[in-house]
Amino acid sequence: MELKRRAWRSLHIWKNRKVAEVSLTIDDFREVRGTKADAEDVINIPRLAAGNQIALFFHQLPDRTRETRVSIRTRAPYDAIAVASRFGGGGHARAAGCTIKGSMAVAKRQLRRAVKELLLG
């Protein structure tokens, strides 16, 4: 439950409410002794943000300190796989994911750029 509270506190909404994102760091997992299973449905937090079309969940796992995992959920007409595949990820049109080498700041910067390009069409 504490991981979800931390995710809610990280909620960031941008691009005129079209995009909502949350994040959990390695420290978040360690401090609350959270597991990957504890974070399974955290992607639903940004999906609940009113009016958003794209939900992003950035998280670092304790066993993979130099990577950031990203879960992507979209509503039509946006395609989640169009973003994830740019980073070697997979999935389908409404739900996809990828792993980006580097810090969370690097991953956010790269993913946000890809999402902005998707929104521009």
Regions found by a protein language model. Give the residues of each.
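Hydrophobic helix-and-loop "lid/oligomerization" segment in the mid-to-C-terminal part
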Residues: M1-R86, G91-G121
